[in-house]
UniProtKB/Swiss-Prot annotation:
Part of the MsrPQ system that repairs oxidized periplasmic proteins containing methionine sulfoxide residues (Met-O), using respiratory chain electrons. Thus protects these proteins from oxidative-stress damage caused by reactive species of oxygen and chlorine generated by the host defense mechanisms. MsrPQ is essential for the maintenance of envelope integrity under bleach stress, rescuing a wide series of structurally unrelated periplasmic proteins from methionine oxidation, including the primary periplasmic chaperone SurA and the lipoprotein Pal. GO terms for molecular function: metal ion binding; molybdopterin cofactor binding; oxidoreductase activity, acting on a sulfur group of donors, quinone or similar compound as acceptor. This is Protein-methionine-sulfoxide reductase catalytic subunit MsrP. Heterodimer of a catalytic subunit (MsrP) and a heme-binding subunit (MsrQ). Its EC number is 1.8.5.-. GO terms for cellular component: periplasmic space. Its cofactor is Mo-molybdopterin. NCBIfam families: PRK05363.1. It comes from Escherichia coli O7:K1 (strain IAI39 / ExPEC). Mo-molybdopterin binds at N88, Y91, E92, C146, T181, N233, R238, G249, I250, K251. Predicted to be exported by the Tat system. The position of the signal peptide cleavage has not been experimentally proven. It is found in: Periplasm. Keywords: Metal-binding, Molybdenum, Oxidoreductase, Periplasm, Signal.
Amino acid sequence: MKKNQFLKESDVTAESVFFMKRRQVLKALGISAAAFSLPHAAHADLLSWFKGNDRPPAPAGKPLEFSKPAAWQNNLPLTPADKVSGYNNFYEFGLDKADPAANAGSLKTDPWTLKISGEVAKPLTLDHDDLTRRFPLEERIYRMRCVEAWSMVVPWIGFPLHKLLALAEPTSNAKYVAFETIYAPEQMPGQQDRFIGGGLKYPYVEGLRLDEAMHPLTLMTVGVYGKALPPQNGAPVRLIVPWKYGFKGIKSIVSIKLTRERPPTTWNLAAPDEYGFYANVNPHVDHPRWSQATERFIGSGGILDVQRQPTLLFNGYADQVASLYRGLDLRENF
């Protein structure tokens, strides 16, 4: 794997500005304004997001042991870990960016069970400790591009998904990989109430083609900024596919199933004209309601310092992944 050529020191994203909002999307889906008026003290105004010290600190995750392969490092300095995860997209805990940090402490991540099933010769079940001990962990500094036209760079910690799938031995019938988030309404208020959860159908589901899942860039992620993932960021394990829009990065995964047919995915079910199965970052294919040609890079500065920059095809990973889609119409298969 060649060294990523698109990252430079100034690209590293401040942890205090990790996520942004998708309220416009929910309005388009017909979700009532009541969903945006939840009586929660954590519903801060957007400007407070840039103040840094006003955001609740991330829950302390345990330090992880991991390597730092040179191909993914670029010697980039990182923002202190106590500013991570102030704003998140995790609708199971509410729509506002402050809601997951405020509410995700209710999620019990240990014990945890992750099952790998379907078109495999050797079905597997992993427990909480397996996620951080069974595979060598490595830190990878990846660009992350949200479908909402903002971007950042994050040092994820995890292991390539292909290593896990190889243990399960996919059969010749396996063509796709389906992922599912835990369904725990008693712990996740957004799964109990459609207004809190944005009207989505739960549990959250995602999917990849098998060749996408087996690509070396695709990461099963268990940590960020040197420590185990906090619950609002998808603990104990989430998916990162850096050349795709962020909603493909399903959180708190309990099931991975290899299938013959293309699996359903949550945002595609909710709005198929707006969110495709592939969700590859593409500056030439706009969202129906906004351009994808440029993006707001979110760094450590204030609101006036947010810079707009050109969106890179496949989020800057075209050299590594473009061959996966040779001959595929990327406008039709968005």
